[in-house]
Amino acid sequence: MDLSIVKLLEEDEEVDSKHSEDDLQMFQDSLIRDIEGSNLKSINNTTGNESEKPQPRYMKLQKMSSKETPWVEKTVDPVNHNLRLARVTDLLRTVVDHQPGKKTHCLNLHYKLKRKELTMEEFMRQLRDLVGDQIIRSVISQLPQLKPGNMGIKVPGRSNHDKVSKSAEFTAQESDPREVHVNQLSSTTSGTLNSSTTVQGLNKHPEQHMQLPSSSFHMDTKSGSLNPYPGTNVTSPGSSSRAKLPDFQHRENNQNVGIASVGGPTKSTINMTTVPKFERPTFVNGPSRVQDGPISDFPKNSSFPLYSAPWQGSVTKDHTVGPSSSVIHVEHKLIDQSFEQAHKPRYLVQQGVTNVPLKQKNAIPISSNDDLEKQSSKMGLFTSTTSASSVFPSMTTQLDSSTMVNMPAPSETIPKIANVTVTPKMPSVGQKKPLEALGSSLPPSRKKQKICGTSSDESIEKFNDVTAVSGINLREEEKQLLDSGPKKNDRVSKAYRRLVHGEEERTLLQKIPLQRKLTEIMGKSGLKHIDHDVERCLSLCVEERMRGLLFNIIRISKQRTDAEKCRNRTFITSDIRKEINEMNQKVKEEWEKKHSGEEKNKENDTEKEDQRSNEVKANKKDEDKERAKAANVAVRAAVGGDDRFSKWKLMAEARQRSSPGPGRNSKKLSGGTQFGKNQGLPKVVRSISVKDVIAVVEKEPQMSRSTLLYRVYNRICSDV
C-alpha cells in the first residue's frame, strides 16, 4: 500500500480504536442496505438526526439529576459519525488493496466525506459505481469483528450496569465543545488495558467519584505539575467548536514521564464536590491511543481552571481500602497566588490538585491525622488548591480527615526527598527570654577580664616567640653582653688610642729636612730655640694647603675643554729603534710560550684544586650567612623591630648577583644606570697639567705675585 494512504488512514485512526460488536453489526447492516438500495429514507432520517443534533452527555446527566435522583441509569445512543469515518477508512483500505489503480478516486471521496460535502448514502453510491457491488460486499464481509469492550459509564444505583460504546463518547466530544475529555494512554506494543470508569456516589453525601487505574496516576516533580493522566488530550470551554490541544511528542530531555505497567485493573478513588454550573463533567475514556503531552498545558486554552472549587467531602475513617491503594486525608485551604510562587517549590501544582512527589510502586494506607502529619513531614507532601466560592483566612495548608484522596503509593516511597525546616516559635513581647535559649551569660567583672587578657597575651607571646623555638634565650644573651661589655670597651679604647698616637706622630714633612730648614730660618731671623710642636704644626699646615690646591686643580681640570697642541708639528715617518724593540719582544714572547706550557699545566692543576677548595669554602660561608640572617630575622620579629633594612639588603645582593661579571666594569655600568644624563656619554680620562696649576695660583691673592709662579712660567718656556 502507498505511504500517503497509510498516513491518511492513521490520522483517522485517532478517532477510535475499538468498538463493541453491536456497533459493528449495525454498521454492516446499514452498509448492506445502502448497497441493496432498500430503506434509504429511514437510514437518512436516523443518520441525519444523529449527525446534525448530537445530544451532549452532560445535558443527559443534568436531566437525570433533575428528574429523580443524581443516580439514575441512562444509556447512550451508540451510532456516531466518527464511528462511520473509522469504519470507512477500513473499508477504503481493503478496496485499495483489491484495486490499487483507483486510489486517487478513493482519496477524493474520502476527503469529501470527511469535509461533509457528501452524505454517507452519496459516498456509498459513488463508491459502488466506481468499484462494483460484488467487491464492496466482499470487502464488508471481510471487515474484522471486535470483541465487546469493558469501557462504559456505570451508575451504582442498580445492580446491572449498561455497556456504553465508544461511539457515544465521541458524539459527546464532537457535539459539546465545553466538555473536558481525558483519554488514557495505552501502548500499541503491550496491548490495551480494559478498565471500567464508573461514576459513583455515596449515600450520605452526593459527590462524584472517578475511578482511575493506578497506571494512569503519575507524579512529575521536575516540571512542577501533577500529572494524574499522562499523555492526555484535553479540550477546554474557551473554543467555539471542538478544540483540540496540539500534539506533544514524548520528550525525555524536557520532562520525565513514567508510565507504570499494570497487570490488572487496580482502582483509585478521587472524591470531588459537585461541579458548579459553569463547569462540565469530566469524562475518562478507556484505554485508547491518545496524544502525548503534559496535562499542565491545558489551562492556556481555557478561560477558567479545570477544578475551580475545592475538594471537600465527609468520609468516615472506617472506610476500607484495597491492598494497592492508599488513603490520604487532605483538607485544602486557599493560598495566595503570589505567596505560592514565592514560597512553594517547583513541584507544587497551582490548579487545586494534590501533589505527591513520589514514584508509586506499592501502597501504604495512612488513616489517621497524626500518622499523616508524621508521614508528610518525612516524605515532603505538599497540597495547594484555589477556591472560587469561599476564601479562607489562614495562609497555610492543613491536613484533615474530612477529604479523602485515594491514590497508589509505594512502600518504598518514604525517601529523604525534602528537608522539613521548623522555624522556632518566638516568645511574646512581655515574655522574658531565658539565658540558655539566647546562648549568652552574664558579663564577667573587669578584674576577671584583665586576668584573662593578661593570660591570653602571655600565651600568645609564648606561642609567637620564635627565639624559644630556635633555642635562643634572650635573658642569658643580655647577661653575657652586660658582663663582657666593660672589658671589651677597655680593649677597644686602648687599641684606638694606639692608632691615633701613631697617626699623630706621622707627618707629611720629614723631620731632618724640616729641622735643617728651620735652623736656617732661625739663623737669619736671630731665634735661639723652637718647640717640637712647631714642627708638627708646620707639617699639618703644609698638608692642608696641599689638599686645597689639589682640590682646586682637579676642579679646573674638569672644566678645561681645549686640548694641548704642540707648537712644532713634526710628522715621524719611521722609527728604527721602535721597530727593533718590537722584534726583540716578539722573540721573547715565543720563547716564553714554549717553556711556559708545562709550567702552566702544573699551575692550572693547582689552580683547579684551589678553586674547588675556594668554592667549598664559599658555599659554607653562604650557608652560614643565610643561617645568621634567618636567626636575625627571627630575633627581630620576636623583639618587634622593623625588618625593612634586611629586605633591602637582600634585594641589593640579588641585584649584584644578577649583574653580569663582577669588577670595575659592572660598577661603572651600575653608576651609568643611576645617572640618566651621563648614561650614553663615554667617560673622558682627565689629567692635570701645568696650565691648571698656573690657573689656580693666579687666582689666589697670596700666590699671584710669588716667585713660584715665575718659576712655573720659566719651566713652560724651557720645555717648549
Curated annotation (Swiss-Prot):
Subcellular location(s) per record: Nucleus
Q: Which CDD domains does this chain map to?
A: HFD_TAF4
Job description of the protein: TAFs are components of the transcription factor IID (TFIID) complex that is essential for mediating regulation of RNA polymerase transcription.
User: According to the lineage, what is the superkingdom?
Assistant: Eukaryota
Query: Low complexity bias: where?
Result: 186-198
What's the protein called, per UniProt? Transcription initiation factor TFIID subunit 4
Q: Does the keyword Zinc-finger apply?
A: no
Which parts of the sequence belong to the RST domain? Answer: 79-149
UniProt lists the family membership as follows:
Belongs to the TAF4 family.
List, alphabetically, the GO terms of the cellular component aspect.
Answer: plasmodesma; transcription factor TFIID complex
Picking any one GO biological process from the record gives: DNA-templated transcription initiation
Q: Report the gene name.
A: TAF4
Which is one GO molecular function term here? Answer: protein heterodimerization activity
Oligomeric form and interacting partners: Component of the TFIID complex. TFIID is composed of TATA binding protein (TBP) and a number of TBP-associated factors (TAFs) whose MWs range from 14-217 kDa. Interacts with TAF5, TAF10, TAF12, TAF12B, TAF15 and TAF15B.
Q: In which tissues is it expressed?
A: Expressed in roots, leaves and inflorescences.
User: Region (Disordered) spans which residues?
Assistant: 149-203, 427-456, 589-628, 654-678
Which UniProt key words apply to this protein?
Answer: Activator, Nucleus, Transcription, Transcription regulation
Which Pfam family name is an example for this entry? RST
Keyword Nucleus assigned: yes
